Amino acid sequence: MKKDGKECLVGGPWLMALPLTGGGCYPNHNANTPIFNDLCTEWTVSSTEARTEGEDVCITVQGSYKEFKGNYTLRINASGEIAVSYTFEALQDVNPRQWGLVFEAPASFDRTFWRRDGLWTVYPEDHISRPVGEAALFYTGLPETIHPRVKPSWAWSRDFNELGSNDFRSTRRNIWYAGLKNEDGNTVTAVSEGHQHWRSWLQQDRIRFLVADFVTPGDEMFLSSYYAPYRKPLKTGESIGGTVKLVVGESNTTQE
């Protein structure tokens, strides 16, 4: 999708229903943990329908993944606003860590910004959970290799892997808005009401972002009973869904 002739969205929507994974508590001193960030697989379209409703264009797509079947509808207007409503039925049992829709932006959209409902009233300025902020895909001035016996002189939030800095790729829960922007001030913004969640990362030569309707903590075995009320295991035949609202254009959000 282009805004004033400039690409802002180049892919999606794709369904993500990332399974909750865990295991025994074993020592592992290898920092090269494999990335687990998969979309649903084997998408096949069964039908498409395009229509106009007033000044809006609506496109409904029916299809199936290996893991889910269902549909989504895109409603697009001339102001650069997109609403994507989706509903999918599970084709197999899954205990999800996160589920929602994933979109893709050009690599130049390498800063993320957000406003969200925080759990606490005060956060350190460089904390990944701060309620209002902006984060870079990668921060400058960091060494490529780090010695385990040397104390870092920078915040942990600036550490990075191939997906980006910790600050850029962390999940922001309960957003009012969150988005990406490039150096020219062009933005892609997810607008919510404090109940959806945002995560962005580098995917090869593009930036991807997830707008999630469900997130839960990781599979930490010692806290399994505490986290149990926050899990939502899905049985075959159960459905997930939601509506993602995106605004494409120049930045008009303020961070107070």
What do the predicted segments below correspond to?
Residues 1-256:
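Beta-strand/loop-rich accessory regions of lumenal/periplasmic or secreted enzymes
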